């Protein structure tokens, strides 16, 4: 009878043994993958359009990868430099397109504004005609006359006056930066600097992941762009992220969104923040609030042409909090403005705060590498605590 229990052939026994060993290897790899997954800090980057999310990602690459070198992580410095130069070369076209879009948008707006803006030098009209004639030319090759006309128009006081009213139409933030660099960009051997690449605006849509390591800690940053209408469908997919970094264009208080040309951009950001803060899938995930574009906010406030109270009447009654810590040499008007915007967001987070998640505000300038380095270092302890709490280790 005992023989009946051992009726398997040698081949069958060997096959079962091999299967058990394969299962052990798979289980071991799964455990390893699980440990790596749990040890990785996953950051979800959110914010309204043109708030600076993609620029934050670029800064992470400059600071913690190998700059603008494709996938990053090359051990060979020469290969890293080669890849970096290659990517920079491919970005030249994007930068030239930004330059072209900037001058086209400004001169097209001159006749559409109310009241319209006239050229300071009427003899420049033929230059305006040229710029408008090439507006929709596909695969534009940027001949020398383009740069000549663009530079002459940018030096026209009427064009500058129209630029000063750019909150009345849709103009990319980097317009002045690249228009001021026409003589550099037009050179045949032009290679963009890191600052040029940080300023370059390319519309993002979809979800992009950037991986980097800081002091042997792995970070995965997910940049979500162009998803205004689809947000409610995919947001639940990120309910296990370590933290949300919410980016706000603080300078957008006097601008409207591209989608409808009516909704105030800062109000749109407040509405989006509220929807994320109260989202049932994210109720345990804390938010690091990047109050971005502080440089542009300061310029607007000090220029005095667009007053915050004209768009947010409650600002007229706002006083700077006693615990405010201005930057060295910062004008009190700028301090009051930036803390008002901060408190508008904190009002949302404290109104529905249940102790399960918190909001940590920071003032940022995404094109300033040292500012982002300092802010991200300040955030790392917060992120680490969130990570420990996420896996009930704290």
UniProtKB/Swiss-Prot annotation:
Residues 196-204 are annotated as: G2 motif. Heterotrimeric G proteins are composed of 3 units; alpha, beta and gamma. The alpha chain contains the guanine nucleotide binding site. Interacts with CRY1; the interaction may block GPCR-mediated regulation of cAMP concentrations. Interacts with ADCY6 and stimulates its adenylyl cyclase activity. Interacts with ADCY2 and ADCY5. Stimulates the ADCY5 adenylyl cyclase activity. Interaction with SASH1. Residues 39-394 form the G-alpha domain. Residues 364-369 are annotated as: G5 motif. Residues 7-25 have a biased composition (Basic and acidic residues). The gene is GNAS. It is found in: Cell membrane. It comes from Cricetulus longicaudatus. This is Guanine nucleotide-binding protein G(s) subunit alpha. One of its GO terms (cellular component) is heterotrimeric G-protein complex.
